[in-house]
Amino acid sequence: MWNTILFAVIPYLAVAIAVLGGIWRYRTDRFSYSSQSSQFLESRALFWGSVSWHYGILMILGAHVVALVLWNQWASLVSNPTRLYTLEVIGLALSLVAFLGLALLIARRLIVRRVAAVTTPMDLVLLIALATQVALGIWIALGYRWGSEWYVHTAVPWLHSLVKLNPKPEYMVSLPAIVKLHAVGGFLLIALF
């Protein structure tokens, strides 16, 4: 039952919340999609945190999406141990860069008084959720090696089943709890946005 809730109900519920909430926010308050700008309040930490965070996370998310969309090509790519090791090292390095950038952005929001004054509770909730998700990804990369390879055979078929409106949670059942938490956390982030 829990697997059905986690891997068949929560993903659809998260997407529904994101779509309906997005429409509602657009109609009621179009400017609520972003935290208040703090660029003029303190920009040095913003630059280093923002650049590290955005470059790191966009490349990590890009790899997740490429493996999802081009799964056969990705499986072929990571079938060679040298390419697999290279992708794993690059992915871990990028996730560490993203995490450090996000940590800098969170610290800036908490420490710089003028920035803290324009920080809403929802800003902090989202930043903590993002940091948790990236930390889980790093934990998986360090503790459950070769994720670039097994992702294609577990999470990708599960995500494809969701898109086809025929959820197959059995693909996720045998994965470690931390991987399951990372997968569900991704959909919770979708709902938060």
Predicted regions and their residues:
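Perimembrane topogenic segments of multi-pass inner/organellar membrane proteins
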Residues: M1-S35
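Membrane-embedded alpha-helical bundles of multi-pass integral membrane proteins
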Residues: P11-V15, G21-G22, S37-F193
